[in-house]
Amino acid sequence: MAESINSLEELGTVAKTEAAAPVHVQKLDAQGRAYATGKRKDAVARVWVKPGTGKITVNDKEFEKYFARPVLQMILQQPIVASNRAGQFDIVATVAGGGLSGQAGAVRHGISKALTYYEPGLRTVLKKGGFLTRDSRVVERKKYGKAKARRSFQFSKR
């Protein structure tokens, strides 16, 4: 590549053509739904988003029944509220693994990704809110010679 460029103008044109931003296009399946997977801790959620009345179903239950704590319900609705799309999409999710908090985070991550697949214009809003970033924090492993990951066994001088 270095041999083919003879002037600074040519270098500028080559740099412009290579630095084109990726274009995000709508990704839908045969039924007109957007599909995405979300992860958090040990939980994995599979999420489908389609236009509808705002009904959210998690593991064949209404999300208010599956996630009884209001904090978890709020976590689930954050990407929808941030993108001003409340009541416009029906969301179906199946989630497995982990506890309720991790599952709520996984469904939130999946909803965010599926919304961007359905409506690519929402990507900037959801990215700014931090909903598209996979939370990589997981439980630290237990080490041998220790009671837990970092806690030592009780020490007795005598």
Curated annotation (Swiss-Prot):
Protein name: Small ribosomal subunit protein uS9
Gene: rpsI
Annotated NCBIfam families: PRK00132.1 (NF001099)
Species for this entry: Brucella canis (strain ATCC 23365 / NCTC 10854 / RM-666)
InterPro entries xref list: Ribosomal_Su5_D2-typ_SF (IPR020568), Ribosomal_uS9 (IPR000754), Ribosomal_uS9_bac/plastid (IPR023035), Ribosomal_uS9_CS (IPR020574), Ribsml_uS5_D2-typ_fold_subgr (IPR014721)
Keywords assigned by UniProt, alphabetized: Ribonucleoprotein, Ribosomal protein
Pfam families the record matches: Ribosomal_S9
Family (UniProt): Belongs to the universal ribosomal protein uS9 family.
Gene Ontology CC entries for this record: cytosolic small ribosomal subunit
Gene Ontology BP annotations: translation
Gene Ontology molecular functions: RNA binding; structural constituent of ribosome
SUPFAM superfamilies per the UniProt record, alphabetical: Ribosomal protein S5 domain 2-like
